[in-house]
Amino acid sequence: MAIPLLSDPVTSTLSAADRATGLPVSAERALVRRAPRERLRHLARVRRNKAVARSLMNRFGWRSAAQYRCLERLWTHESHWNERAHSPSGAHGIPQARPGAKMAAAGPHWRSSARTQIRWGLRYIRARYATPCTAWTHWQSANWY
């Protein structure tokens, strides 16, 4: 007569979620501990990018809070203010320029520099829509700008 095992020594050390993901418990815990720090870094980067945009908007003559709110909404929808954002269609950066290389006209570090991307995006908005609110209005009706 075989004696049944009370528990499998390998699977008993893994939670159901760990077994589903295939990650060892220690790796899962490390991800959970790291997540808040990465979130804080992301939020700090977003705040910094928005501050850069606010500063540059003044140079374009867009000083009103309304124009800033329009730009904030527009680029939140486009990229969540992430300078590393990349869409499947090939759009890149905070303003989601397509192709991303168009932003090279604003500076050599267009792939990674939020300031370069924001400068290019504000120039694009001025040339095509005149103001961030006009660009936002277009985005609301067409889901692109």
Summary of predicted features, one role per range:
Residues M1-R69, T134, Q140-Y145:
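Intrinsically disordered, low-complexity
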